[in-house]
Amino acid sequence: MGMPVNDTIITKNIIKVSESYLMPLYKKLCELIRSEEVIHMDETPFQVLEEHKANCYFWATKTTAEFSRHPINVFHYANTRSGKVIKDIVGSNYQGIIMCDGYSGYSNHLYPNAKFGSCLVHIRREFINIIKALHNRPAKSSIAQQAVSLLRPLFHMEKHLKYHTKEEKAAERRKRLKPLLDSFYDYISQVKRPLGKLRNAIQNAIALKLRVYRIFENGQVPLTNNPVEQAIRPSTLIRKNSLFAKSIRGAQASAVYYTIVGTAKMNHLNIYKYFKYLFDHLPNRENKDIEGFLPWAKEVQAQCHI
């Protein structure tokens, strides 16, 4: 007869493992992402019964596909969507650029040393949605269609830029993309008395113009925040299946596991092999150095690469 195991025992041990063995690795990844010059950030709701409120949140942070030191994807649990959570993730004096959506929590008043970039794909999507919804109202649709048409060559041009460094990329963008983006903003700025969703789309695009133009300051800034939204997607699928976490410790443990799995995937590791490697070696490591267990470490790559 084996030891009886139930859901409660399994859950307690999953949490215990995250706190006792995986936390140093998690903290190291959190530390490293704070040193990145440009990062993606987004948040998604999650219910935690112990908090006695409708929504808590997982905040996701991800390094950029180009020019980052290492591929990292960090999840942070918080019981609020307040922009004050950002300081718990990257510190109150973060001086890099945070790619984000238009949510007011990403505030220069709260973080005067940081810069915020905005997702041009989100801006374009608002006009695309108008075209889909107002196909039988040609006046509004034609304005939205023209706005989308003005952005289309910009995305095409971005894919064909030639550069080796982020400085060269920024210079190429200023030369080739800026006239296209200027034309888009010139056009939507002269639209007279827009109404409804068209007005909202135009006002939002204009409000975020300074943040959109970050792409000309730093070539590492991407045009889109989609990568972090895609990184969040697995956690939303888990939310649909599990519905909620019972405890705060459970939610925090989830953030640890999401972080390690997400970062392992970005570094092309076999997830099962990586966790086995961690559990075989972490409990018996002779020193406090965690560097050798990071997903891009030489031995980890040798043992766990897909």
Predicted regions and their residues:
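Catalytic center-proximal scaffold of phosphoryl-transfer enzymes
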Residues: 1-306
